[in-house]
C-alpha cells in the first residue's frame, strides 16, 4: 500500500524530520486559504497521486500569486494526471498539496528498502538527488552509497554519520543528516514499511538538511497491525480490478496483454505466464486463486479477469492438490454462465479430481476447451486469442 506525499510528510513530522509547511486541499478555495495561512508570495502546488513523474506531467508547479494557486487547483482537482508511471488513463487527483517554497542549494537522495538477498533494511544515499535513482543505479552505480541495518541492533548513528561524510556534507549538516537517518529507520520499522524515498533531500541556502519529498510504501501483509496506516488508504488510486481481487483475497496484478490467466499457486502462475509468452502470446494479468480456493472465489476471479475488455481468451491452469479440480470446474461454469462469456476459455486440470472436473466442463455445453497438457493449453489459448 502506498501513501500520498502529504501523508508521508505527516509521518515525517511525527518523527521530528524537517518538512515544509503545507496543507492538503480538496477544493480551490481551500488551496487559496492554505496559501494565505502559509504566507509569503511564492508557493509550490502539487497534485497528490500515487505515481512519479508528476513534475514533467505538469502536476507540480511553482506559483507566485493566489490567482495562480486557484487556477492550478481548478485545473487538476477532479481530473486525471498521466505520467510515465501511470497507464493512459492516469491517476485521479482528489487533493492538491500547497507548500511553502524552499530555496535549494543542493539536492541529495535518501531511500530505504527491504533487501531480500541480505534480509535486511538497506539505506541508499546519493549526491544525485532530484533524478530517477534507477537511472543513477544503471549509469553510475558507484554514486550510490549503502548502509545495511542489522535487525538485531537496529540503525546506529555512526551509519548515518558515515553516509553524511561520504556525501560531502559539513559537520553540522552531518549531524542533521544523522537525525533524519535515525528518524527514518525508526519509522521504517515501526510502521512496517517496504519502501521509503526522499528525492530530493535538499540542502537549503541556509545550509540546513530538508525533506522536500516523501514516497512511502507499506508492506500490505502488515496492515492488520497498522490501523493508523490502514486509514490512510486511498482506494481511488488502486486499479479497480486489483482492489476487487483484494476483497476476495486473490493475488491479482493487471498487465498489458490479451490472454487472461487464472492459476492456483504463485509459482505455477509465473510459469504459466512464461509459457504463454514463449508460445507467442501476451498475458493480460497475473492471478493466483490460492491453494484454499472456494467456488465463490474462483467465480469472482473469473469475473475480474473478464472485466478487462482487452482479454480475448482465458487460460485456466489448475493443479489439484489442496484444491479440488471439480470444485474449480463448478466455479468456472458458474462464472461463465453468470457473466455471459463471449471469449474462448481453455482449461488445463491436473491432479485431485481432475477427471471429474474435466467431465463437468465437457458436459456444461459452454465454450470451454479442454487441454491435455500445459504446452497444449498455451498453444490453444494463443491461437484462440488470434496469436496476438
From Swiss-Prot:
One of its GO terms (molecular function) is succinate-CoA ligase (GDP-forming) activity. The keyword Ligase applies. One of its GO terms (cellular component) is cytosol. Keywords: ATP-binding, Ligase, Magnesium, Metal-binding, Nucleotide-binding, Tricarboxylic acid cycle. Pathway: Carbohydrate metabolism; tricarboxylic acid cycle; succinate from succinyl-CoA (ligase route): step 1/1. Binds 1 Mg(2+) ion per subunit. One of its GO terms (biological process) is tricarboxylic acid cycle. Its EC number is 6.2.1.5. Mg(2+) binds at residues 199, 213. Substrate binds at residues 264, 321-323. The keyword Transmembrane helix does not apply. Residues 9-244 form the ATP-grasp domain. Gene3D superfamilies: ATP-grasp fold, A domain, ATP-grasp fold, B domain, Succinyl-CoA synthetase domains. It catalyses: succinate + ATP + CoA = succinyl-CoA + ADP + phosphate; GTP + succinate + CoA = succinyl-CoA + GDP + phosphate. Its cofactor is Mg(2+). ATP binds at residues 46, 53-55, 99, 102, 107. Heterotetramer of two alpha and two beta subunits. Succinyl-CoA synthetase functions in the citric acid cycle (TCA), coupling the hydrolysis of succinyl-CoA to the synthesis of either ATP or GTP and thus represents the only step of substrate-level phosphorylation in the TCA. The beta subunit provides nucleotide specificity of the enzyme and binds the substrate succinate, while the binding sites for coenzyme A and phosphate are found in the alpha subunit. Belongs to the succinate/malate CoA ligase beta subunit family. This is Succinate--CoA ligase [ADP-forming] subunit beta. It comes from Idiomarina loihiensis (strain ATCC BAA-735 / DSM 15497 / L2-TR). The gene is sucC.
